[in-house]
From Swiss-Prot:
HAMAP family named among the record's database cross-references: SucA_OdhA
SUPFAM superfamilies, per database record: Thiamin diphosphate-binding fold (THDP-binding)
Name recorded for this polypeptide: 2-oxoglutarate dehydrogenase E1 component
Role according to the record: E1 component of the 2-oxoglutarate dehydrogenase (OGDH) complex which catalyzes the decarboxylation of 2-oxoglutarate, the first step in the conversion of 2-oxoglutarate to succinyl-CoA and CO(2).
Family listed: Belongs to the alpha-ketoglutarate dehydrogenase family.
Amino acid sequence: MTRKNTTTNPWAKFHGPNLGYVIEQYDLYVTGAGSVDPELQELFEIFGAPSFQDDVVTGDNTATHFSPQNTGNIEKILKVVQLVEQIRSFGHTLAHINPMEDAANGQSLIEKTMNELSDADLKAIPAKTVWQDAPEGIHTALDVIHRLKDVYTKSLAYEFSHIQDSEERAWLHQMVESNSLRQPLSNKKRTALLKRLTAVEGFEQFLHKTFVGQKRFSIEGVDMLVPVLDEIVSEGAKGGVEDVMIGMAHRGRLSVLAHVLEKPYSHMFAEFKHAKIEGAVANAGWTGDVKYHLGREQVVGNEEVSTRVTLANNPSHLEFVNPVVEGFARAAQENRKKSGLPEQDTTKSFVILVHGDAAFPGQGVVSETLNLSRLNAYQTGGTIHVIANNAVGFTTDSYDSRSTKYSSDLAKGFDIPIVHVNADDPEACLAAANLAIQYRTLFKKDFLIDLIGYRRYGHNEMDDPAVTQPQVYKKIKNHPTVRAIYADQLQSAGVLNADEVETITQFMQEELKAEYAQVPPADTSAATIHVKVPEVVAKGIQPIDTGVSIESLRAINEGLLSWPEGFNVYPKVKKILERRKDALEENGKIEWALAESLAFASILQEGTPIRLTGQDSQRGTFAHRHIVLHDTDTNETYSPLHRLPNINASFSVHNSPLSEAAVVGYEYGYNVFAPETLVMWEAQYGDFSNTAQALFDQYVSAGRAKWGQKSGLVLLLPHGYEGQGPEHSSARPERFLQLAAENNWTVANLTSAAQYFHILRRQASILGTEAVRPLVLMTPKSLLRHPLTLSTASQLSEGRFQPALEQENLGAKPNKVKRLVLSTGKMAIDLAAEIESGKHEYSLDEVHMVRVEQLYPFPAEKVQSIIKRFKNLEEIIWVQEEPRNMGAWHYMAPILFELAGDKVKTGYIGRPDRSSPSGGDPFAHKAEQELIVAHALDVKYNFRQDKQEIEVFSN
């Protein structure tokens, strides 16, 4: 049956699961119980049974010559192979990774397999049959199992089996199974680590005793977060990283500020004491924020190796800082000083995100941000995630806050390696940090450390956690701190003696006392009820000429309509583009999309980079932009804006994932870190922007007032009532207007292509200056090609953006005008269309109309000057297409009252209060819209005396 060949041994190349397969095949070959792989059958015929010889044979610990024929127990071999893989995949289930619990026990899969194998069975099998790369000193399968259990089931536990790339998975296993990851620390480094833990503990305890009852959201229980961050930052700096961006919530933030970002203790104490201290640099805006929300930027390291660390400002809306910090990093990585796409270098910066164990699985923005990690428009070359896991969210236990075993399980779906580590094992924590930074450097992908500890006090320092977790807090009360545990370990190892440990502690206490002594008494004079907005913000954006010569515009347009020879533009798109050829000639008309492209090109030629993202931004939701062309034969892409002459700034336009919150946060962060760049986010429809409401509320509208964090982000929000129902009508302008105050941003709803051209150029001109602020634009849908929104070349080449426009062909007889109509956006165009149509039977002599292009800040002086022309004015009315409780009415009402004075009535025409923004019946919509227009322009419709509105509809 077998043609035995003794000259070579082909079985040496089979190991682990592959070996198991070969043995199974040989069993089938011998018994004839099933079909055998033809190639293996030939090997069995030539070489006989698989046999293996260990490299080293010494004493009782080494298996001698071994083969299935010698032992007759193939099942034992297979079980060992199975056991090895089980330990690698499920060792974390037995690991001692929770300092508040004993090591895991019970009938796990691993233990079940272990019980089926004796030590004698394991000793009989050479190590290399189940572990090809077994380290020196590992001779038998028993040695292998002991070694792997030591690696995978102690205070470090790993989850790598979900990693799809076999090369990455092999590298991870090799790193943790070899000796390279857990090299013993030098006594010097161990002493330094103890000093660091002493500083963290001492700082927190000093705050606890000195500022009794004040909120600080202590780090105690996960103290090792600070050394972990130290290690990652330090290793990054050694690798040449210029910027490390950190995003984290309030838990442990003060300690991170003091230690990782080197904020002086005296400055921290001054904030608690409400005192002014010399040298303190305020990073807050005019309204400010609580101390545990504030960020900091600091160069750390020494003359030889240093890096800039940025801790992002953060609200208490957990995890929403994540995409903001990712945007920081991408901005830091990109060179935007050349035409074309920006040049990205992921070695220049990286992100560390510190998550909460309840927030990581609980907040949807986490998964939205993780989804960005591999996308070309958003990837940053890998983020290091650290879950500061204290096993409780305020008063909610983990079994009530997540449906998964670990808080980190969400990361598995994004192919992210996970290390769980006991926060009471300092050296294991540093090993995890080192693995994270090495993986990120090599593979440019995300990595997650689950730092499992506890929370020594309540959610805040005024909270008693024993009310809801009495048993846990009995344990915690008697549990030694990680500093105490590590100090005992160093004493037992002979690294330090008790006196030296006490000296370290006393030195820390003396330093804290000395820092506190520098803090002057509380400065009560600083308290005031008057918040002063900086003058440059208060006075708003000053008039800026934004015209571009017709010659330049024509040259740009020619370039926009050019593409490489042989590039096959889609025929329908080609027709659209060809219609633009004569747009800048004497009788030409410029539509919205062309005005935008001309604005972009002129902005780029002036040296301002542009970044535009949105779910369909390359083509445009409404098939209007076509800023990226696709070859019909090859699917290659081409953007004319990358090839225009005289440009030394980058242009990038990306289709975003189906996400609003993460993408808005990312673009906001990008703009904060790249203030010279015109960054624009476009909603697919404005209706969907409200899923990013937390970003609008906490960052875009209030970031400067709270933190002094300037942004010039542009939001493009398609808005307009066209009978498309409640999900495709409203960008909720009322919400942006409700947030409008202190000149925090500009809110506009435009009615012409030229106005769009000028406002974009105005926005670009204020970037990087103190006058900068975000721009919120209600952009058109049906108006994109509407005849009344088209502009001429001269309207682009002359003048500037106009916050308010008077309607042409009205108000020619000022003494006859009784009604002044104010409106904005599509509603204003609907009114203008009725005026231009000439089909109305009523006279328009008594009506004048103003298009309010800029809703906030409201152009009061301009409108007031118009009002003064009409001596017989009786009423000023606001007309809108949105329901009365939506749109701009509630924002406009007090403005109109003030403009009108005592003699002129003010009022509203539009839809009544409604719970839904729009109806779903297009015919009903059309009928309603016609009624609104008629009531607005026909003065026979008078206001009711008991209401300041014309009752167009009855509810």
